[in-house]
């Protein structure tokens, strides 16, 4: 089985984990926790990624937890954090986990150098010492210990709020670290909003992020039956907060593409993700498009915005036979297809 570069570096440092009760969190994407369980006394995983949670939950020797924060009471004496791409998300994870497990907790941090992991030493200073022990495969590995008291973790402290005014709709957006649209409303989403037809019936906002698209759609078309979904617990919690602060209602679902969705829908609408961590990632969007006919009513419509260089028209034509470009700029294109 192949492991990520970060996991390969962890495998060089097994002495840190022998006989320990380890909690792993962060930018996890492979099955290395299962391998580590052969060395550690126990291995638990905390993830904000619903797809990863599903894959790890199949293993009897892994105690897997999904959510926006870790609520379960666990007996842990070592944290292993895979450094996220977003520095704010790394800060969030350390603050949340160290507040839970407190002083004298040991921590190992691993990550690709281009992910910003080399800032870990400075970011860990409020908690205690952190020392680099390995550097290989363009990754760095650190060990440290929380020696200082940690202030209680309050999720509300981590939301960023910002106003938007798009297509005549004024809203407040609430987003957590690591969530798409954390602090800004992107031009692709603006183009999509300004291109959408008059919506009716059941509408799915796929890959909802902080809920910006969904909130605008609901504000402009209050009678639609709207569902927002995302693979990220941080995104789902952000979207819920965005809707709450704007007094809007919708259904929110954590899902791995269609895994938890029922359908059918009148509209599948998305600014689909193509970045997962540091790697360009098309698989989720490919599956979203390929399975779209199974989740659309007979007259249902798929509408997505994408970078113009991406090969989505071919995928859409394979799935729904025809693909139309409704609008475009020099960077983005709105694609549409009817069942």
From Swiss-Prot:
The keyword Signal does not apply. It catalyses: guanosine(1207) in 16S rRNA + S-adenosyl-L-methionine = N(2)-methylguanosine(1207) in 16S rRNA + S-adenosyl-L-homocysteine + H(+). GO terms for molecular function: 16S rRNA (guanine(1207)-N(2))-methyltransferase activity; nucleic acid binding. It is found in: Cytoplasm. Keywords: Cytoplasm, Methyltransferase, rRNA processing, S-adenosyl-L-methionine, Transferase. Specifically methylates the guanine in position 1207 of 16S rRNA in the 30S particle. HAMAP family: 16SrRNA_methyltr_C. Monomer. This is Ribosomal RNA small subunit methyltransferase C. It comes from Photobacterium profundum (strain SS9).
């Amino acid at each position: 089985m192949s492991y990520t570069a970060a996991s390969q570096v962890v495998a060089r440092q097994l002495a840190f984990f022998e006989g320990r009760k380890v909690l792993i969190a962060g930018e996890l994407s492979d099955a290395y926790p299962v391998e580590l369980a052969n060395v550690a006394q126990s291995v638990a995983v905390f993830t904000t990624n619903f797809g990863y949670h599903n894959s790890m939950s199949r293993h009897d020797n892994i105690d897997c937890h999904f959510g926006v924060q870790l609520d379960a009471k666990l007996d842990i004496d070592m944290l292993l954090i895979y450094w996220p791409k977003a520095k704010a998300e790394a800060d969030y994870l350390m603050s949340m986990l160290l507040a839970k497990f407190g002083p004298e907790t040991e921590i190992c941090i691993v990550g690709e150098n281009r992910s910003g992991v080399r800032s870990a030493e400075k970011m860990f200073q409020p908690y205690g010492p952190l020392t680099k022990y390995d550097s290989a495969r363009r990754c760095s590995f650190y060990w440290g210990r929380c020696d200082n008291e940690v202030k209680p973790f309050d999720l509300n402290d981590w939301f960023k709020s910002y106003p938007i005014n798009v297509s005549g709709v004024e809203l407040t957006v609430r987003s957590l670290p690591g969530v798409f649209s954390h602090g800004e409303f992107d031009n692709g989403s603006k183009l999509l909003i300004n291109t959408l037809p008059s919506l009716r019936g059941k509408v799915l906002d796929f890959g909802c992020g902080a809920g910006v698209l969904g909130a605008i759609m609901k504000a402009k078309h209050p009678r639609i039956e709207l569902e927002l979904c995302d693979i990220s617990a941080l995104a789902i919690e952000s979207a819920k907060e965005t809707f709450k602060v704007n007094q809007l209602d919708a259904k929110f679902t954590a899902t791995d593409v269609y895994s938890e969705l029922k359908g059918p829908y009148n509209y599948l609408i998305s600014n689909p993700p193509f970045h997962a961590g540091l790697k360009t990632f098309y698989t989720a969007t490919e599956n979203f498009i390929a399975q779209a006919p199974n989740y659309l009513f007979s007259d249902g419509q798929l509408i997505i915005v994408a970078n113009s260089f991406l090969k989505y028209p071919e995928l859409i034509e394979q799935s729904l036979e025809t693909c139309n470009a409704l609008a475009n700029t020099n960077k983005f294109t709105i694609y549409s297809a009817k069942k």
